[in-house]
């Protein structure tokens, strides 16, 4: 009956092969869990390719977030895409670089998790970035987990760790959504800063233990990240996270906000906002109120920009844009792709990002050939926001 779907990830266009691995640091809720995408060497043997949806629990988490029956929806999600794999080397050998690679911290959106932006992350890694994607523990992820020591074990080992799962937090009837989402966005920023600190320590040669069995060996990163060239990026709730993180941490030199959901940011934040921020919006998500808040930030920072990708929808900036077949689309109340071909959309957004990152991280690349895209001049782009905006 055509249950199996596939994910047609765009082939990467950069000069580097891409590796990825997961890192969990700390044995409590305050620890850190993130996926790392990075330039890797060609391995002598065939490397394993990781699953796109890393575990069955994420299928049930997605079903629950989308308000489907957890058991049936999870089963269908798993049948549809549970066997899809990422075209990267799992824990592949890190490709060393004396001057280090620039770093991007990428924050996922509401109801997402660390693997749902793999198309962007793989492409950026192929272009010579290390990309870290924290899986947020503020209960905005579809689901996530942490590992803690089993109570009966005296001698801690990786094998004696117990998983504790964290479900998605829905706003209850009668609750004000802002009072839920605002503390979450602040926690998300703290989690991004913890990942930044971990990678800073590893780069400096300090020992940081990855407690995941068979997880990525962080010591291979020593001296290979250029901590003077760091950007923060995110989609939707992650876009708001990136904007707030830029204001809180001066080590971030710029932010890229993909279809940022501005709602969780408190109004008195805006005078303290830093730039430059590059807002890359889709055509069918933003409201005039939201765009006006973006304009407030742009008015304070002349290098900040807003562009809109015409023919795109909110999920055009996630991996769901590349899922073929109709089954997954039935789970979503809104479209997973717009009228713009998703591969064309990915290409123009990545090129715009790269031009912006070159400009503000002082990269020695040729991405300035796409500087016109930063101004919203190019195929399927418009500067600012279109006149006819959707109402959420």
UniProtKB/Swiss-Prot annotation:
Monomer. Catalyzes the hydrolyze of the acetyl group at the sn-2 position of platelet-activating factor (PAF) and its analogs, leading to their inactivation. Hydrolyzes propionyl and butyroyl moieties approximately half as effectively as PAF. Also catalyzes transacetylation of the acetyl group from platelet-activating factor (PAF) to lysoplasmalogen and to sphingosine, producing plasmalogen analogs of PAF and N-acetylsphingosine (C2-ceramide) respectively. Has a marked selectivity for phospholipids with short acyl chains at the sn-2 position. Broadly expressed in different tissues, but high in B- and T-lymphocytes. In brain, expression is restricted to amygdala and frontal cortex. This is Platelet-activating factor acetylhydrolase 2, cytoplasmic. Disulfide bonds: none annotated. Its EC number is 3.1.1.47, 2.3.1.149. GO terms for biological process: blood coagulation; lipid catabolic process; lipid metabolic process. It is found in: Cytoplasm; Membrane; Endoplasmic reticulum membrane. It comes from the Eukaryota. Belongs to the serine esterase family. One of its GO terms (cellular component) is endoplasmic reticulum membrane. It is a lipid-anchor. Keywords: Cytoplasm, Endoplasmic reticulum, Hydrolase, Lipid degradation, Lipid metabolism, Lipoprotein, Membrane, Myristate, Transferase. A lipid is attached at residue 2 (N-myristoyl glycine). SUPFAM superfamilies: alpha/beta-Hydrolases (SSF53474). InterPro entries: AB_hydrolase_fold, PAF_acetylhydro_eukaryote. Inhibited by phenylmethanesulfonyl fluoride, 3,4,dichloroisocoumarin, diisopropyl fluorophosphate (DFP) and diethyl p-nitrophenyl phosphate (DENP). The active site is at 236 (nucleophile), 259 (charge relay system), 314 (charge relay system). It catalyses: a 1-O-alkyl-2-acetyl-sn-glycero-3-phosphocholine + H2O = a 1-O-alkyl-sn-glycero-3-phosphocholine + acetate + H(+); a 1-O-alkyl-2-acyl-sn-glycero-3-phosphocholine + H2O = a 1-O-alkyl-sn-glycero-3-phosphocholine + a fatty acid + H(+); 1-O-hexadecyl-2-acetyl-sn-glycero-3-phosphocholine + H2O = 1-O-hexadecyl-sn-glycero-3-phosphocholine + acetate + H(+); 1-O-hexadecyl-2-acetyl-sn-glycero-3-phosphocholine + a 1-O-(1Z-alkenyl)-sn-glycero-3-phosphoethanolamine = 1-O-(1Z-alkenyl)-2-acetyl-sn-glycero-3-phosphoethanolamine + 1-O-hexadecyl-sn-glycero-3-phosphocholine. It holds the Pfam family PAF-AH_p_II. One of its GO terms (molecular function) is phospholipid binding.
């Amino acid at each position: 009956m055509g249950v199996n779907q596939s994910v047609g990830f765009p082939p990467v266009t950069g000069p580097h092969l891409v590796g990825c691995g997961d890192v969990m640091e700390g044995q409590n809720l305050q620890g850190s869990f993130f996926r790392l995408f990075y330039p890797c060497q060609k391995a002598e043997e065939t490397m394993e390719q990781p699953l796109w949806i890393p575990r069955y629990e994420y299928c049930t988490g997605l079903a629950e977030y989308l308000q489907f029956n957890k058991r049936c929806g999870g089963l269908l999600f798993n049948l549809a895409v549970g066997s899809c794999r990422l075209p990267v080397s799992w824990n592949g050998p890190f490709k060393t670089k004396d001057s280090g690679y620039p770093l991007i911290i990428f924050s996922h959106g509401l109801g997402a998790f660390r693997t749902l932006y793999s198309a962007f992350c793989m492409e950026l890694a192929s272009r010579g970035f290390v990309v870290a994607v924290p899986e947020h523990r503020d209960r905005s992820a579809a689901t996530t987990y942490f590992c803690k020591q089993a109570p009966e074990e005296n001698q801690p080992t990786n094998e004696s760790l117990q998983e504790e799962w964290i479900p998605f937090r829905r706003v209850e009837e009668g609750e004000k959504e802002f009072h839920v989402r605002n503390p979450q966005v602040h926690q998300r920023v703290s989690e991004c800063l913890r990942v930044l600190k971990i990678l800073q320590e590893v780069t400096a040669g300090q020992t940081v233990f990855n407690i995941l069995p068979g997880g990525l060996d962080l010591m291979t990163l020593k001296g290979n990240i250029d901590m003077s060239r760091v950007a923060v990026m995110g989609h939707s709730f992650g876009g708001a996270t990136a904007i707030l993180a830029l204001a809180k941490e001066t080590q971030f030199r710029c932010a890229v906000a993909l279809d940022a959901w501005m709602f969780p940011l408190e109004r008195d934040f805006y005078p303290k906002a830093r730039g430059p921020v590059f807002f890359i919006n889709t055509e069918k998500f933003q409201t005039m109120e939201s765009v006006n808040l973006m304009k407030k930030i742009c008015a304070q920072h002349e290098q900040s920009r807003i562009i809109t990708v015409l023919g795109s929808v909110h999920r055009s900036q996630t991996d769901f844009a590349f899922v073929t077949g109709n089954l997954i689309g039935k789970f979503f109340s809104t479209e997973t792709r717009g009228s713009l071909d998703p591969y064309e959309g990915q290409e123009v957004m990545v090129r715009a990002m790269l031009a912006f990152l070159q400009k503000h991280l002082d990269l020695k690349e040729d991405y300035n050939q796409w500087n016109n895209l930063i101004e919203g001049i190019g195929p399927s782009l418009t500067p600012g926001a279109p006149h006819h905006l959707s109402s959420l």
